[in-house]
Amino acid sequence: AFGTILKALAKIAGKVVKKLATKPGATYMLKENLQ
């Protein structure tokens, strides 16, 4: 069950990253989130 949750989160994260990557300032946003 835990593995399924991780897979779901990975899919969601991938979608978010793709959306951010198409917008200006995406790199800045990612850096801020990682800190």
UniProtKB/Swiss-Prot annotation:
Location of this chain's protein in the cell: Secreted
Q: In which tissues is it expressed?
A: Expressed by the venom gland.
* Sequence positions bearing Glutamine amide: Q35
Per UniProt, which keywords does this protein have?
Answer: Amidation, Secreted, Toxin
Which residue windows are transmembrane per the record?
none
Keyword Secreted listed = yes
What are its GO cellular component terms? extracellular region
The answer to whether the entry has keyword Secreted is yes
Judging by the UniProt lineage, the source's domain of life is: Eukaryota
Q: Which GO terms describe its molecular function?
A: toxin activity
The UniProt family comment states:
Belongs to the cationic peptide 04 (cupiennin) family. 02 subfamily.
Name of this chain's protein = Cupiennin-2c
Species of origin reads Cupiennius salei (American wandering spider)
